[in-house]
Amino acid sequence: MEARFTRGKSALLERALARPRTEVSLSAFALLFSELVQHCQSRVFTVAELQARLAALGRQVGARVLDALVAREKGARRETKVLGALLFVKGAVWKALFGKEADKLEQANDDARTFYIIEREPLINTYISVPKENSTLNCASFTAGIVEAVLTHSGFPAKVTAHWHKGTTLMIKFEEAVIARDRALEGR
C-alpha cells in the first residue's frame, strides 16, 4: 500500500506555485465564450445593451486578472505613470489572457487623455459569427471591460470601449485627474 504513494514524484507536485501553467484549450474557450455571448444576447434587446453586458462581465474578470498577476509577480513595483500602466496592459495582461502581446499601443494626436490598443485579429472575435442585423456588434467589449477594470483597480480610472478599426481597437479615455497627476510626476 505504501508503494503507490512513494513510487515517484508527480509532475503536478513539482510545479511552482508562483507560476502555474495557464493554458486553456482554444476550443473550450471558444465554446464557453460563445455560450456567454448567447446567454447575454437572450437577455437584451439592442446591440448597445449586449456590449454593455459583455463589458460588465469583463470588468469582473479584469479585477481578478489583476489580483492574480500582482500575486504571482515577484518584486513587482506599482506603476505610477500612465505609459507604464498601459505597457503593463499591452504586455503582461495581454500575455496572461491571450498568450501574446497586443499588436499596437498608440496615443491620440488631438487628446492627451485618449490612447488606443490595437489588435488586428483578436482571439475573442475569431469564433463569433455576427448576424447582419447586428453588424455593429464587437464582442471585444468583453476585453474592453477587462482592460477598464485592470486600469481602474491600478489607480488609473478610465473608460474603455471597443471599436472596429484596423481590426479591433480599444479606445482608452482616462479621467482628467489621471493625466494631471501624470504631468505632476513628470515635473519632479
UniProtKB/Swiss-Prot annotation:
Pfam family, one: TRAPP
Location, primary (coarse class): Golgi
Domain of life of the organism encoding this protein: Eukaryota
GO cellular component terms attached to this protein's record: endoplasmic reticulum; TRAPPI protein complex; TRAPPII protein complex; TRAPPIII protein complex
Alphabetized UniProt keyword annotations: Endoplasmic reticulum, ER-Golgi transport, Golgi apparatus, Phosphoprotein, Transport
InterPro entries: NO_sig/Golgi_transp_ligand-bd (IPR024096), TRAPP-I_su5 (IPR016696), TRAPP_component (IPR007194)
Biological process annotations from GO: endoplasmic reticulum to Golgi vesicle-mediated transport
Job of this protein: May play a role in vesicular transport from endoplasmic reticulum to Golgi.
Subunit structure: Component of the multisubunit TRAPP (transport protein particle) complex, which includes at least TRAPPC2, TRAPPC2L, TRAPPC3, TRAPPC3L, TRAPPC4, TRAPPC5, TRAPPC8, TRAPPC9, TRAPPC10, TRAPPC11 and TRAPPC12.
Family, similarity comment: Belongs to the TRAPP small subunits family. BET3 subfamily.
Protein name (Swiss-Prot/TrEMBL): Trafficking protein particle complex subunit 5
Organism: Bos taurus
Gene symbol of the encoding locus: TRAPPC5
